[in-house]
Regions:
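N-terminal leader/linker segments that precede catalytic domains of diphosphate-processing enzymes
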Residues: 1-148, 156-169, 177-216, 233, ...
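Surface-exposed, charge/polar-rich loops and edge strands
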Residues: 153
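NUDIX/MutT-family hydrolases
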Residues: 219-247
């Protein structure tokens, strides 16, 4: 595969994943730690309606000096509920994600982007053979990127989960795949930080590869996928260029392809999570 072509494709998608951010974003602090960035309107709304939040000198913060993780979680739940009632948070999931690393609190998944809180996700490149990937098409009812192609497995790391636990859960839900039946290889990670209609998407995505034996039957279990298909790497690269994959899954796929091709010097984008300082913002 043409190395120059791959590099240019990664650079083009990287520009979409990490564009310049709006200068008016307000840093959001929990327990004195910068955990997110919110639009000024969101910061004002919460500070005016929920006791325990302040907006002062350009910093949006939880007034939480004496609070433990449960109390902070309760305050964030109150704020998220107020935002939901006002129509400023939609797509409620009743799923809790961690705030900060190590965790300082938990928050409803749907509210993360309103606060610009960094989330973590795991994605799996499923190889049928060295030149063929198994991919999944997102269901039409999905809130984000309906109908686009995706990695076979991909999803958020829930509060209290390890990366491996999240990957195993998502593999079972999305493909009926028992992770202990395949050999999983850890790839690199990357971070997306971009404005979205819901606020700010700040997400660290961890990449994994696995070879899927022909004997394994793959079937979606949670209704969030409407097709599973096999595509050659050449077909996948063409689909990425045509915008047929989600941005996240395109970058996940290219991480694997470039790594396997020995292209490991893509600066300031793909990184080794275990040795990196990029664990939050």
């Amino acid at each position: 595969m043409d190395e120059v072509r791959l590099r240019r494709l990664v650079e083009r998608l990287q520009a979409r994943a990490r564009p310049p951010l709006p200068t008016e974003l307000v840093p959001f602090h929990v327990a004195g730690t910068h955990v997110g960035d919110a639009q000024p309107a969101i910061a004002r709304f919460v500070a005016e309606r929920v006791a325990g939040f302040v907006l002062n000198h350009g910093v949006f913060a939880m007034h939480d000096g004496s609070l433990d993780i449960e109390a902070r979680t309760s305050l964030l739940a109150e704020a998220a509920t107020e935002l939901r009632s006002a129509g400023l948070v939609t797509g409620w999931r009743d799923e809790q994600l961690s705030v900060g690393n190590p965790p300082l609190a938990n928050i409803e998944r749907a509210a993360c982007r309103a606060f610009g809180i960094t989330t973590e996700a795991v994605h799996l490149n499923a190889y049928a053979d060295r030149e063929t990937l198994i991919v999944a098409r997102r269901a039409a009812h999905k809130q984000f990127d309906p109908g686009l192609w995706d990695n076979l497995v991909g999803g958020m790391v829930a509060a209290g989960e390890s990366l491996r636990q999240a990957l195993a859960r998502e593999a079972l839900e999305e493909a009926g795949l028992q992770l202990d039946r395949v050999e999983v290889q850890r790839g690199r990670s990357f971070q997306m930080r971009r404005p979205v209609p819901e606020g700010l998407q700040s997400e660290i995505i961890h990449v994994y590869d696995a070879a899927i034996p022909d004997a394994l039957t793959l079937k979606n279990q949670d209704g969030e996928v409407d097709a599973i298909d096999r595509r050659t790497l050449a077909e996948i690269i063409a689909a990425i260029q045509n915008g047929e994959l989600t941005l996240e899954s395109a970058l996940v796929t290219l991480e694997s392809v470039t790594r396997r091709a020995g292209i490991d010097d893509l600066p300031a984008f793909y990184f080794d999570y275990e040795t990196s300082s990029i664990h939050a913002i």
